[in-house]
Amino acid sequence: MASRRRTLLKVIILGDSGVGKTSLMNQYVNKKFSNQYKATIGADFLTKEVQFEDRLFTLQIWDTAGQERFQSLGVAFYRGADCCVLVYDVNSMKSFDNLNNWREEFLIQASPSDPDNFPFVLLGNKVDVDGGNSRVVSEKKAKAWCASKGNIPYFETSAKEGTNVEDAFQCIVKNALKNEPEEELYVPDTVDVVGGNRAQRSSGCC
């Protein structure tokens, strides 16, 4: 039976409410942006098929609520993550100052096997707002924070204009692969019509 081997990568996006987590995800997956803000309730996710270095992956991107009342949901959603994306608004110092809290909460609730080397990526979003005149967090300050956390990759993005979104997620995929478990999805290309049995998806270790 012919089958395609496909790896599932789970990515979590964290940050304060309103920094543009949902917009970044929609821009990357659907190439769409909406000016209408709607707070995420609990958590939601989108998937995208991506090819990287001649391999096929299913990227599962989880968008979690930034409101404190939903943070207790973290354990269920964070476990099994291959990469964590931290997002702040370059026009909001508070959202930047809260990055430490989001990072620590993820490490506590996700309990990765190697927390010191778990892959994070930082995105400074909304660089397009007011032509950059409303900016309060400098690129230098953001890069210094990344350096203090083990040289976390950093991108300045605009979900509205699509600036650096594709490049950021390529980096996210690359970093997620460093944490990839030895487990893959087997997606059958054929169905056993004669026997009347639909080929089943199964997972296993390679």
UniProtKB/Swiss-Prot annotation:
A lipid is attached at C205, C206 (S-geranylgeranyl cysteine). Transmembrane segments: none annotated. InterPro entries: P-loop_NTPase, Small_GTP-bd, Small_GTPase. Keywords: Cell membrane, GTP-binding, Lipoprotein, Membrane, Nucleotide-binding, Prenylation, Protein transport, Transport. The lineage of its organism: Eukaryota, Viridiplantae, Streptophyta, Embryophyta, Tracheophyta. The keyword Transport applies. This is Ras-related protein Rab7. GTP binds at residues 15-22, 63-67, 125-128. One of its GO terms (biological process) is protein transport. It is found in: Cell membrane. SMART domains: RAB (SM00175), RAN (SM00176), RAS (SM00173), RHO (SM00174). Protein transport. Probably involved in vesicular traffic. One of its GO terms (molecular function) is GTPase activity. GO terms for cellular component: plasma membrane; vacuolar membrane.
